[in-house]
Amino acid sequence: MVKPYLIEHKDEPLNKELIMHIHEMMTTKTLKNAEDEGKFRTTNDIVVANEITNEIVHQPPTYEEIPEFIEWLCKFVNEPAQGTFIHPIIRAIIVHFMVAYMHPFVDGNGRTARALFYWYMLKQGYWLMEYLSISRIIYRSKTSYENAYLYTESDDNDMGYFIHYHLKVLLNSFKELKAYIQHKSKEQTESLKIMREENLNERQAEILALYKNKTDTVLTVKEVQSRFAVSDPTARNDLMVLVSRGYLEEIHVNKVKVKYVIKR
């Protein structure tokens, strides 16, 4: 997985080899030509087009400019004390923008740009990034993402448009994480309450809490086994305990498969 690799290598300086390896990891088995994985493009036969209209929205700089750009990017990341102070978050956003703008690879530039953004944020001590998913939010607002680039290019490369968009993405990511933590905290509180009142073990209480929080929940032994990382016999026993206590009931889908629902 890419994220553990980014975490493991967050203290390393940025260099050409690291950028290429991150691209290779992000694009393995996803490109038309596997030889393009982890390699900078060597042609100018590349444009960025709108996925729906196929309208060309960006013509990346020539491939001859890529070596100089990579050298600049590494210096920008590795020597932040040089020149005007730029806040680390803004600097990370600039890295994201510039990699996607330059399009140093045949494909997978957006994925690589986002990975480098994550990496730089982790490098600067923003450990919470491990738990955020900006890619999901960018995917949901893809038009705004593309427009942020277009507005920047059309307004004399004023990167403020992209920075503003990206900060909103980060804020929404934090909000989603906060909501998730609050939801899980509520689930845990509910589980502890059930565990005390119903004399169940912690895992059984968590299973029952799932049903109480969402009464149309349907689980199988395999799903419990996967969700709680337990063996088949343990998952089966937990569900049978809840059945024997009158909380759940079995529904036989066929001769083999059994589903468990809350008892009405």
Label every model-predicted segment:
Residues M1-R264:
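FIC/Doc superfamily catalytic core
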